[in-house]
Amino acid sequence: MTIKSTSRRSILRGASVAAAATTMGSLMLPLSAQAAARFTISDTDFMLDGQRLQIRCGEMHFARVPREYWQHRLKAIKAMGLNTVCAYLFWNYHEWREGRYDWQGQRDAAEFCKLAQQEGLWVILRPGPYACAEWEMGGLPWWLLKKSGDAFLRTRDANFVQPARRYMKEVGRILGPQQITHGGPILMVQVENEYGFFGEDLDYMRDMKSMLQDAGFDVPLFQCNPTNAVVKSHIDGLFNVVNFGSDPQTGFKALDQVQKGPRMCGEYYSGWFDTWGAPHRRGSANGAVADIQTMLKANGSFSLYMAHGGTSFGLWGGCDRPFRPDTSSYDYDAPISEAGWTGEKFQAYRDGIKPFLPAGETLPPPPPKNPVIAIKPFAFKESCTVAAAMPIKALSVTSPQPIEQYDISRGLVSYRVTLPAGPAGKLEAAKVRDLAWVSIDGKQIGTMDTRYRRFSVDLPARSKPATLEILLYTIARVNFGVEIHDRKGLHGPVLLNGQPLENWDIRAIDFDADAVLPPLMWKTGRAQGAAFWRGGFDVTQSGDTFLDLSGWGQGIVWVNGRCLGRYWSIGPTQTMYLPGPWMKQGHNEVVVLDLTGPRSARIEGLTMPILDKLRPELDLARPPSKVKPALDGVKPAHEGEFAQGSAVQDVKFAQPLKGRQFCLESLDAFDGKQYAAVAELSLLGVDGKTLNQSNWTIVYASSEEAIKEDGGALNAINGQASDFWHTAYSGKAATAPGSKHPHRLIIDLGAEATIAGLRYTPRQGPEGVTGRIKHYRAYVGDHLVKEN
C-alpha cells in the first residue's frame, strides 16, 4: 500500500490490486471475472478500478451464526441492498489456550470470506486484537490475566503486545490471501477498535498499525471512534471512520476536522444489545433509514451494526460495565433477526437503500425462510448434582486467588474450608466474580453477587466444626473499559469475623473453549440444588426452534453435546435459539445445568422467540430498593450550568473532596421539559483522569424509563455513549411524586475516593432531544442516601 500525505487534512491512500471483479453499472462486485482492479481512498471517494464506490456495509459475526447458515445470511445481507459485509475476529475464539490456534469448522474465517465473495460482497475485516462486540473479554484471551496488574491490556506493555503480535501474524497467515490485493474480497482492515473510548497513547495505535502491516496486510488500514473521540485519536496516515447511532451530520463534521476523504460511519446502530434483567432493546427502522439516506445523499458510506446479530452460542457472551452480563441472544433488533428472518424492518431498509443504487444494479430477492418447527413439551427425568460432577482431586491453597492463577478459564468452582465451632458472625471475601452460593454442611445460607457488590454473608452459630462450601459460577468477562482486567473466582483473603480463613480445597468444572460437558453420572429423579438435568426429544424432520426455558432458573443448555449458551429466567430473553442443522433425525439429547433448581423440569420448542419478558421477582439476589436521598444540610461540591449540545463536558470543582458517594442533581433541562438524561457520567481525580468505575453501583435514581426503552440508570456508568439514563416518561412512574425536577442520580464508588471534578456526556442525538441537563448541582459525601 502506498500512502501519500500532503497535510494533516489531505491524505491519499492507494492499493494496486489484481483482483477478481466485475462491473455492474458503476459498481465493482467481487465476483469471479478475471480483471485488473485498483482500490484507493482519494480526497473525495473510495475508488475501485477508477470508479467511485459507495460502501453500503452490514456487520455479521460468523462466530455467532451456524456455519451451515453463513451463506443464507450473506444472501440476506446482499438482498437488503448492501455491497459489503463487516466481520470481527475474536482473538480468544481462535486462541483460547495460548499457542493453540483453531481456524477449522465454525472458526473458518477464510471460508467465510470466500462465501462473501461468492455472494458478490466485499469484506471489511476487524481483526482486533481487541474487539468489544459484547463478546467475552472483548475478544481478548483469558490467559493474559495470568499476568499481574490492572492496567496492561490494550497498552504497549510487553505482556500484551508480544502475544498480540504473535496472534496477528497468525491472522495474516490465514487471511492475508483473502485481501483484494491477492484476489480476495477484503477491501480494508481496521486497526484495534474504538481506542478513543479507552486510552490516549497514540503510539500504541501506531504500534497496532505496524503490527498489521508486519503481518502482511497491504490493503488500506483505518481506525474507528465515536464522534466525541475522533479528533483526539487521529494519527497521520491512518484513515478515520466515525461510529454513531444518530445525528450523522455531527459525526461527519468530526471527520472533516481531521482529514479529507470520503466520509464513512463505521458503526451505525440498527438496535442495541440486551443485558440480563433489563428491558429488551429496540431500534427505530424509520429513524435509521432516514439517517442512512442522509449519509448516502452526502456521498457518505456506512456500515450497519448489526445487519444480522445472531447468537452468542456457547459461553461467548460478554458483559457490559460495571457488571451487566449480556444475553445469549444477540438479536440486536437488527433488520435480519436472530434466526435469519427478513420482515418489515428488513423491507424498510431495503426500500430505503434501493433509490441510491448505482445505475444498472438490481437487488436479488431475499432468501427463503428456513424451516421452523415446534417441539412438544418433554420432561427431564434424570439428574446429576454439580457436587457429583466435580473432580475428586482438589487443589489445596492457603487463601483463594483468581482462578486464572490455577489455569482455570471459566465455569463452576467449588471452594471448601473447615469452619471452627463458634458464635454467629460474618463471612466476607475481598471480591467475588461472579455469583456464589454459600452453604454450611450442605445447607445454603446465602449468596454473593458481584452485580450488587455483595461479598459477605451472615453465618449462624456452630456448636462443632462444619464444612463451608462456596459454589461459584462465572458468567462472563467484561468486554469494555478498564474493567476488561476481569479476573474470575473467589478473591482472598476470605475473612470470618475479620480473621482470615485458610487451608481451602478447590475443585472446578472448566468449560473451556467449547463448553464441553464433564463426565456425568445420571440418576433417575429430581436432584436438589445445583444440578445437571437430562431429557430429550425426537424429530423426523429438523428445523429451527426456540427452546422455552421460562420454567427453569439460571444456567446453561446443551443439545447433542453442543452448547447453546446461557439462560436466566429474570429475562428479558426466555427462549434459546436452536438451529435446525444442529438437530438430528431421531433422538436429540438435551442437558440443562440449573444452579437454582427448576420450577418445572420441562421444555418445549416454540416457533417464535420470547425476547422481551422481564421477571425481576425471580432475581433472588436483587436487593430491595429502600433508600432515598439524604442531601439535607449537605453543601454542594459544585453547581453550575452545562453547555447546550451533545459535546462531552469536563467540570473542575473549586477544591477536591473525599467521599464514597456522588450525586448529580438535575435542576432543569434545556428543552424546558420535566425529564433528565445522562449518556455517561465519569468522575475526575486530582490528576484530571477519570476514576476507575469497576466497583461503582447506582444506589438511587429518581426514576428510570423502562417501558418504551431501556432508560436504566446503569446506562449512565457503562461507558457507552449511545445509550443513556432517562427519567420515566411513560406509565405510572411518569406522573408519580418525584417525576419532575429536581432529579437525582446517586452513585456508590465502592470505597472512598478523592473527587476533583466530573465529566458529563449529554444524551446524544440532534438538537431538541429530551433530557439534556441545563442547571445542576453535584454532591460528594459518605452517606448521600438513607433508609426510607
Name each model-derived stretch.
Residues 4, 10-32:
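N-terminal export signals
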Residues 35-84:
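N-terminal carbohydrate-binding accessory modules
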Residues 72-79, 86-135, 213:
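Aromatic-lined substrate-binding rim segments of carbohydrate-active enzymes
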Residues 163-232:
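Active-site neighborhood of glycoside hydrolase catalytic domains
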Residues 245-337, 341:
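Catalytic-core region of carbohydrate-active enzymes that cleave or remodel glycosidic bonds
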Residues 394-398, 560, 624-660, 670-755, ...:
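Disordered, acidic Ser/Thr/Pro-rich linker "stalks" and the adjacent N-terminal cap
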Residues 424-439, 468, 537-560, 567-568, ...:
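Aromatic-lined ligand-binding clefts that engage carbohydrates, nucleic acids, or primary amines
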Residues 470-475, 592-598, 665-672:
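Short beta-strand-plus-loop segments that form exposed binding edges in beta-rich domains
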